[in-house]
Amino acid sequence: MKVGAAVFELPGVVALEELSFSGRTPFPYVPGLFYLREGPFVTEALRRLSVVPDLVLVEGHGIAHPRRAGLASVVGLVTGRPTVGIAKGLLCGEVSWDSEDTGWVTLDGERVGLAYRCGRRTYYLSPGHLTDLETLLELMDLTDRRPHELVRRAHRLSRS
């Protein structure tokens, strides 16, 4: 498995540091237990960075997860860093669209995330660790409604 990490300064999306590394994972993919497979690699990537990020975006869910603790939540707990999850699919809950391209993800009557459309794709943001729904709105503002671009850059590093 190969993982990538990138640190940006916002606003302006200035790249400060990028890295990638690979290793073997002893765990198979198990739906809902993504952390067992990906978590150790994500936390190791964060450990290897020389720049300590103020906020970590994780490709995976935060509290918009059946256990209310997805990959972003667990990575935050393990590292002690504030995290936000960003995912391309909704694991649980439902979206109530406030506008054509933005809505809230609710689970058991509680807001647990933000959904937004960019082009034909829908993305789902949810607080992980030491963050809240307000953090999601601030992130949307700081990235011109494109936080997925930051995660995509790190994802590309894992594919190179």
Segments (PLM) and residue ranges:
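C-terminal binding/interaction regions
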Residues: 14, 39, 44-46, 89-90, ...
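Glycine-rich loops and low-complexity Gly/Arg-rich segments
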Residues: 13-15, 29-33, 80-84, 109-110, ...
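A contiguous pocket-lining binding segment that forms or flanks enzyme active sites
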Residues: 65-110
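Flexible, glycine/proline-enriched loop segments at strand-loop-helix junctions
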Residues: 29-33, 59-66, 121-127
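Solvent-exposed, flexible loop/coil residues
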Residues: 25, 31, 67-68, 109, ...
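Catalytic-site beta-strand/loop segments enriched in glycine and acidic/polar residues
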Residues: 43-75, 79-81
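A glycine-rich, hydrophobic loop/mini-helix early in the fold
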Residues: 1-52
